[in-house]
């Protein structure tokens, strides 16, 4: 199967070279459209695991029988594990990306245990594979964010300018993680954290390669865009009753847009955890310029 995938990849590259040659003869606009197409393809490929998880939630919400011997949540958990095995066996996911998923699964589940215990949200379905009130599939939902960042880093061959020291970003991520717990006890310093995020990552640019040339964008803008898409995904998750907020018990409504800020902070934690695995890939100047 791996050999077949490699052959298909080589064949597609040949087709793309011919398309690129035609696009270059058509002028700047056709080149832009061709590159935009490839940007979308790479983004979709980076979202592979997260997209499959969302598809699972939608499909089981629509078609899973209420009297099935295996609960919906348990099916999603077992299928997520099977997806990971297939992705690793076929080479569609690297061991480093799998390590990211395991790491996120642990940290995400720990936070879920606290949040469900304090009533922040609930999981209305029954399950056998759970810890406390948290079905094990939830760790994979957090892991899909880390998987996306790790895959995007590899696919777009990220480079950075103006990047803060990794040790400083780690301290910021630890403070954010602590605040997710502390805010339930009346200690909420998220606005100070937002200021820290802007100060630390505001000057940073991420350089990414779609095809041959590198493009760049502010890293903070990238964080915000991903946080927005996570918010869209969360609305899908609550709509399919995979989990619910207290205000959604009687009838579903969209998750408040203010939650985008929480997802932005979660993005910082996710990015720092992934960048720990890619720390050697950060340029020496970027690792030591700031602070």
Label every model-predicted segment.
Residues 1-291:
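Aromatic-rich, lipid-facing transmembrane alpha helices and their immediate juxtamembrane interface loops
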């Amino acid at each position: 199967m791996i050999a077949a995938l490699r052959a298909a990849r080589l064949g597609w590259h040949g087709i793309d070279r011919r398309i690129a040659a035609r696009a270059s003869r058509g002028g700047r606009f056709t080149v832009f459209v061709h590159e935009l197409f490839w940007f979308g393809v790479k983004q979709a490929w980076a979202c592979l695991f997260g997209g499959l998880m969302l598809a699972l939630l939608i499909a089981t919400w629509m078609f899973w029988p209420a009297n099935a011997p295996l609960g919906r949540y348990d099916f999603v958990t077992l299928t997520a594990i099977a997806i990971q095995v297939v992705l690793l066996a076929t080479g569609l996911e690297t061991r480093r990306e799998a390590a990211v998923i395991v790491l996120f699964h642990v940290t995400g589940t720990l936070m879920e245990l606290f949040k469900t215990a304090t009533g922040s949200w609930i999981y209305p379905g029954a399950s056998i594979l759970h810890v406390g009130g948290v079905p094990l599939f939830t760790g994979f939902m957090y892991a899909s964010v880390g998987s996306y960042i790790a895959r995007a880093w590899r696919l777009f061959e990220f480079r950075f300018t103006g990047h803060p020291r990794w040790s400083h970003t780690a301290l910021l991520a630890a403070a954010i993680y602590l605040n997710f717990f502390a805010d339930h006890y009346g200690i909420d310093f998220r606005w100070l954290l937002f200021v820290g995020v802007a100060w630390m990552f505001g000057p940073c640019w991420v350089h990414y390669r779609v095809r041959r040339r590198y493009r760049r964008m502010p890293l903070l803008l990238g964080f915000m865009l991903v946080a927005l898409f996570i918010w869209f995904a969360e609305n899908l998750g609550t709509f399919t009753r995979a989990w619910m907020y207290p205000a959604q018990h009687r009838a579903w409504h969209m998750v408040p847009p203010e939650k985008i800020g929480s997802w932005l902070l979660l993005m910082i934690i996710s990015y720092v955890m992934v960048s720990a695995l890619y720390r050697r890939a950060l340029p020496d100047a970027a690792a030591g310029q700031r602070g």
